[in-house]
Amino acid sequence: MSGDNQLGRLVILAGPSAVGKSTVVDRLRNDVPNLYFSVSMTTRAPRPGEVDGRDYFYVTAQEFQDKIDCGEMLEWADIHGGLQRSGTPAGPVNEARQNGRPVLVEVDLAGARNIASLIPDAETIFLAPPSWEVLVERLTGRGTESEDVIARRLETAREELAAQSEFKHVIINDDVDTAVKAIEDVLLGA
């Protein structure tokens, strides 16, 4: 890296299910020039229409374990009872930062904690709902999850909301344009 290259800012985004992370991330991908959005690595098979390197990096369980063993993962989790693994590979994030690009990583609470402990200069953002009632309404209004799944997600949301003080920035998503602008400001150091 040359002396005049500035390290790109790393922003970690977390928040409960149905808070609007996907909507905000989609807008940021279109609105922020040169943004690198971290692509997760997974051991699951690609779904129809998914592209390796765009949707996920698809690897075998052994390749994933090798990445962990070599310190090449910023965070990871066993999912579906350990049948699959998913996580954030360090290489692409570090490369984008070294090239001066702002980097956005969307992860869960545990992932945010892990990455922040490894990269202390990371900016952490918790995307919060305007109220608990709004979050419940958004989650149940989707109509895509069973009552059991909704109950589990709401319990997880309570834990996540209780931890929001761990984040450097808490942004209330009561208006998408305002939330996107606030995250852009953090990404670009405004």
UniProtKB/Swiss-Prot annotation:
Q: Which residues form the signal peptide?
A: none
Q: Which GO terms describe its molecular function?
A: ATP binding; guanylate kinase activity
Q: Give the matching Pfam families.
A: Guanylate_kin
Gene3D superfamilies in UniProt: Guanylate Kinase phosphate binding domain, P-loop containing nucleotide triphosphate hydrolases
GO cellular component terms given for this protein: cytosol
- Alphabetical UniProt keywords: ATP-binding, Cytoplasm, Kinase, Nucleotide-binding, Transferase
| Subcellular localization, as worded in the UniProt entry | Cytoplasm
Where does the record place the Guanylate kinase-like domain? 8-188
Give the principal location in a single coarse category. cytoplasm
User: Which PANTHER family does the record cross-reference, listed alphabetically?
Assistant: GUANYLATE KINASE (PTHR23117:SF13), GUANYLATE KINASE-RELATED (PTHR23117)
HAMAP family per the UniProt record, alphabetical: Guanylate_kinase
What is the protein name for this chain? Guanylate kinase
Write down the species: Corynebacterium glutamicum (strain ATCC 13032 / DSM 20300 / JCM 1318 / BCRC 11384 / CCUG 27702 / LMG 3730 / NBRC 12168 / NCIMB 10025 / NRRL B-2784 / 534)
